[in-house]
């Protein structure tokens, strides 16, 4: 079915805005995935702040032109499902990776992060990035461990001086 020129321009503009605001992008082939499964994927993506859209390849190439995601042009072959992470760089990769475990026909093609192309086998790097809260928790545990070690050392020195004075 042919799409009107105005509709094509609107799609390109919408995807371009999503690309400009995104932290990372993941491209997949969803051929053979049921409508119910895709609906669940879209719902999960929406909740995680991920923009998901099926777009024609020619429109997608125009939409990402001039953005950090034009490195993905070679991955725009066949039916293309693209996801842009708006809040966390690894969100789209994590969602697609989890979804692919239950759907054997769902194939992740590639990803892009900070203008760098990541092949499908490298997507684990992006998916394993800690969320902001996880990173803060790790940092706080490191800081807390260092301060408690310092406090124990100071207490040991104090105890040694008290023992020597007694």
Swiss-Prot record:
Gene3D superfamilies cross-referenced by the UniProt entry:
3.30.70.1730, 6.10.250.2350
Write down the SUPFAM superfamilies for this protein, in alphabetical order.
Answer: Ribosomal protein L10-like
Gene Ontology cellular-component terms for this entry are: large ribosomal subunit
GO MF terms held by the record: large ribosomal subunit rRNA binding; structural constituent of ribosome
UniProt keyword list: Ribonucleoprotein, Ribosomal protein, RNA-binding, rRNA-binding
Q: Is Cytoplasm one of the keywords UniProt gives this record?
A: no
GO BP term, pick one: translation
Is RNA-binding given among the entry's keywords?
yes
Q: Which HAMAP family match?
A: Ribosomal_uL10
Q: What is the recorded function of this protein according to its Swiss-Prot or TrEMBL entry?
A: Forms part of the ribosomal stalk, playing a central role in the interaction of the ribosome with GTP-bound translation factors.
- State the family it belongs to: Belongs to the universal ribosomal protein uL10 family.
The annotated subunit structure for this chain is: Part of the ribosomal stalk of the 50S ribosomal subunit. The N-terminus interacts with L11 and the large rRNA to form the base of the stalk. The C-terminus forms an elongated spine to which L12 dimers bind in a sequential fashion forming a multimeric L10(L12)X complex.
Name the record gives this protein? Large ribosomal subunit protein uL10
Q: Which gene encodes it?
A: rplJ
């Amino acid at each position: 079915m042919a799409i009107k020129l105005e509709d094509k321009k609107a799609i390109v503009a919408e995807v371009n805005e999503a690309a400009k605001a995104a932290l990372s992008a993941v491209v997949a082939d969803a051929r053979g995935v049921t409508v119910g499964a895709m609906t669940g994927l879209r719902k999960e993506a929406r909740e995680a702040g991920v923009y998901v859209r099926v777009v024609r390849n020619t429109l997608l190439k125009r939409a990402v032109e001039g953005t950090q995601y034009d490195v993905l042009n070679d991955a725009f072959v066949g039916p293309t499902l693209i996801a842009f992470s708006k809040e966390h760089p690894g969100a789209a990769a994590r969602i697609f990776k989890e979804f692919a475990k239950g759907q054997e026909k769902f194939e992740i093609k590639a990803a892009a992060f900070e203008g760098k192309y990541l092949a499908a086998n490298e997507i684990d790097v992006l998916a394993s990035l800690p969320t902001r809260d996880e990173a803060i928790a790790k940092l706080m545990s490191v800081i807390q461990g260092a301060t408690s070690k310092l406090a124990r050392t100071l207490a040991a020195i104090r105890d040694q001086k008290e023992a020597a004075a007694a």
